[in-house]
């Protein structure tokens, strides 16, 4: 079966904030090859790769597909997901489980150079309709556009953002309020399902708090009410009801959210 894209994937944050069907973001590694300020996934703090196994990925994704079959896009993310030694196999698994959805990978694009002459790679991307959501650094937009165009894969390229500036996204601070008003103000994309280590989180701030704790020897608390375990018992209703203020919100301060660094 061929899933070639008939038109270019349109990346729009406004849709993801609340208009699309679900977007699933599955973190397959904590490792990254950049050291970006204010990384929302705290990748610069990671001390180990935390590569998801193919077995766990397939089991978790199958359960997600059972609960949420009608999603918009299934994304691999990290860290830098292309550092996972089996990320192409994971894309293939996701493609066959979510045969009617878009399948994508968020990346900084730095590993694409080694595939410049790899025709099998580009044919796989094209035939499986794999979307590359690329953040552009160091003025490489032209190179990335030309690379995808050269291999007839321009429909598979989505420029996510310009990585030339950074804004504050995470500010851990205990004793904060937990309220519907704060939750609505928070701004994390409400149509996203954040998945890591077999669990669903409402936001990366909670999802990657363990990296902060380990790096700084801190004690942010993630309770059983702050995540859902993805297993055979998970239901669509649980996922939908989960999109509400969580106990972890008491450890997050929004006062400097989105301020430029």
Would you name each region that the model predicts?
Residues 2-105, 112-116:
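Conserved alpha-helical substructure of the radical SAM core
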Residues 6-11, 153-162, 255:
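Amphipathic, soluble alpha/beta structural segments
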Residues 54, 84, 141, 242-246:
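Generic detection of long, well-ordered alpha-helical segments
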Residues 61-62, 117-121, 235-237:
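A generic local structural motif
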Residues 66-69, 125-127, 243:
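Flexible, charged surface loops at secondary-structure boundaries
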Residues 83-197, 201-205, 211:
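Conserved AdoMet/S-adenosylmethionine-binding subsite of the radical SAM
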Residues 171-261:
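Accessory C-terminal segments flanking Radical SAM cores
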